[in-house]
Amino acid sequence: SITDAGRDRSDPHELGTGYPLYAAKYIRSEHPDTDFEFIDLGISGDQTINLVARLQADFIDIQPDLVSIHIGINDTWHRAETREWLDNETFEANYRKVLTEIKEKTNAKILIIEQFLLPVPDKEFFREDLNGKIDVTRRLAREFADCYIPLDGLMAKACVGCEPTHWSADGVHPNENGSDFIGRLYADAFNEMLKAGKLG
């Protein structure tokens, strides 16, 4: 839902109200002479296994120039009530399958956006599962990504001297401030790849 953000799923160019909207706004304003096409295919509640099922339609068939992936918090959230966590090996296998297929069957550059959790009391216990999965994500990023946004650390930094509720009401779903913050980071990563000659 962080990427989905209420988008109109009948129109993949409609970016909802979350970070994709802000990222596109920044990129368009900083590159006014380039007509970029932005597609948002985020689906609220999806986990890594759902991305595997969507590989053909949402990645391979489209053949994008850049793929950005922000996945993983739901692999933790959906099991939090029972604490019957998905093992890290299965999480990695799912994520690795997605990244391998993108590498092998498209020419897309890959931007991975790390999953994050803000310091809110009722979800602190998520860390017993989430931290290991962030480690997996970072390891996969070193292997597959052209650029990486270490969002968990950056959001932790943003909460120093600023209440977590400034960014998110529940510690997981960004509000307008949080979405703008992530969108800015996305645009910075995009510009970094552009400057390095990885795009275009």
Predicted features and spans:
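Serine-esterase "nucleophile elbow" of acetyl-processing enzymes
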Residues: 1-41, 55-63
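Catalytic-core regions of hydrolytic enzymes
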Residues: 43-65, 82-95, 103
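A short acidic, helix-capping loop that chelates divalent metal ions and anchors anionic groups
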Residues: 4-8, 49, 76-81, 119-123
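Catalytic His-Asp segment of secreted/periplasmic serine-dependent ester chemistry enzymes
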Residues: 115-200
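Structural recognition of the beta-strand scaffold that forms the well-ordered cores
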Residues: 37-42, 66-70, 109-114, 148-150
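Short glycine-enriched, charge-decorated loop/helix-capping segments at active-site entrances
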Residues: 9-14, 81-88, 125-128, 167-169
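Cell-envelope and extracellular/periplasmic
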Residues: 1, 11, 41-46, 66-83, ...
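Active-site segments of SGNH/GDSL-like serine hydrolases
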Residues: 70, 74, 98-134
